From Swiss-Prot:
It comes from Homo sapiens. This is Melatonin receptor type 1A. It holds the Pfam family 7tm_1. Gene3D superfamilies: Rhodopsin 7-helix transmembrane proteins. Disulfide bonds join 100-177. It is found in: Cell membrane. High affinity receptor for melatonin. Likely to mediate the reproductive and circadian actions of melatonin. The activity of this receptor is mediated by pertussis toxin sensitive G proteins that inhibit adenylate cyclase activity. Possibly involved in sleep induction, by melatonin activation of the potassium channel KCNMA1/BK and the dissociation of G-beta and G-gamma subunits, thereby decreasing synaptic transmission. Changing residue 54 to W: Exhibits significantly reduced B(max) and slightly enhanced affinity. The lineage of its organism: Eukaryota, Metazoa, Chordata, Craniata, Vertebrata. Belongs to the G-protein coupled receptor 1 family.
Length: 350
């Protein structure tokens, strides 16, 4: 799902340098983007995990996948991105073969883990709204943990072939050890199809079914019995949809470039502008810091918990405590249902 790279066979080889013809400001710009991404990624996703841990209103089956997605985003900020940053500062990779392979492997683990978790979230929302009578049984705490474990096992199975296929290589254009699209056309096409296009189709199907059902319910119910969809409920549903849309926008260019390269590597690689290739990569990198921002902007429960955690840190209070016992939160919280003649249609909260 990533770029056309240059081989780095072993740690004893000379350092691979970037293209000397590049403008001097480019490396600085890429470094600034990456530093911002790393800082926001780490702080934001730690806030997400702590928010779910502290607040009972956020501790539900759907948010198990949200925490799992936050972990996937954290993976790249903790190890691969700092190594890419060092490569930018050194104008080449001088960390050796092992770090290159581990960095590329963890990047793949993060992106595929992210898309599989986003798919899991979409399926969870679909079951919650379209099959609500079966939801509690399908998504018990035990089952939800099993689903998350399955997601990571599938992610691991999807990434491991990269180590044996020799597709993890250093690319000086992006200062990263990454998936080389030109090594095997068939393998690259398979990666894009099964690790991006198929999950995207599943997610689109789930969200389309949700919107269709909600619209049908609103049209069928008599005016005096028409269910009220609270603004907060609508925002909670839209939050995860926005997460999906931004992920698709950030990663689609890189995947379509991969398909183009795989179709005819010899002729397509020289025809892809370097600026487009680099921009598509760093746009994909940038996506890892967006989710926590989305939750804070669109979800009131997360926004309040972010504020509590920050205040706790600033006042040196212990923040590993259950904040849902606050006076304002003692009223029992329930998602408001949408009733139909033969089923219950609910709008879940993140």
């Amino acid at each position: 799902m990533q770029g056309n790279g240059s081989a780095l066979p072993n740690a004893s080889q000379p350092v691979l340098r970037g293209d000397g013809a590049r403008p001097s400001w480019l490396a600085s710009a890429l470094a600034c983007v990456l530093i911002f991404t790393i800082v926001v990624d780490i702080l934001g996703n730690l806030l997400v995990i702590l928010s779910v841990y502290r607040n009972k209103k956020l501790r539900n089956a759907g948010n198990i996948f949200v925490v799992s997605l936050a972990v996937a985003d954290l993976v790249v900020a903790i190890y691969p991105y700092p190594l890419v940053l060092m490569s930018i500062f050194n104008n080449g990779w001088n960390l050796g073969y092992l770090h290159c392979q581990v960095s590329g492997f963890l990047m793949g683990l993060s992106v595929i883990g992210s898309i599989f978790n986003i798919t899991g979230i979409a399926i969870n929302r679909y079951c919650y709204i379209c099959h609500s009578l079966k939801y509690d049984k399908l998504y018990s705490s035990k089952n939800s943990l099993c689903y998350v474990l399955l997601i990571w096992l599938l992610t691991l199975a999807a990434v491991l072939p990269n180590l044996r296929a020799g597709t993890l290589q250093y690319d000086p254009r992006i200062y990263s050890c990454t998936f080389a699209q030109s090594v095997s056309s068939a393998y690259t096409i398979a990666v894009v199809v099964f690790h991006f296009l198929v999950p995207m189709i599943i997610v689109i199907f789930c969200y389309l079914r949700i919107w269709i059902l909600v619209l049908q319910v609103r049209q069928r119910v008599k005016p005096d019995r028409k269910p009220k969809l609270k603004p907060q409920d609508f925002r909670n549903f839209v939050t995860m949809f926005v997460v999906f849309v931004l992920f698709a926008i950030c990663w689609a260019p890189l995947n379509f470039i991969g398909l183009a390269v795989a179709s005819d590597p010899a002729s397509m690689v020289p025809r892809i502008p370097e600026w487009l290739f680099v921009a598509s990569y760093y746009m994909a990198y940038f996506n890892s810091c967006l989710n926590a921002i989305i939750y804070g902007l669109l979800n009131q429960n997360f926004r309040k918990e972010y504020r509590r955690i920050i205040v706790s840190l600033c006042t040196a209070r212990v923040f590993f405590v259950d904040s849902s016992n606050d006076v304002a939160d003692r009223v029992k919280w329930k998602p408001s249902p949408l009733m139909t003649n033969n089923n219950v249609v609910k709008v879940d909260s993140v």
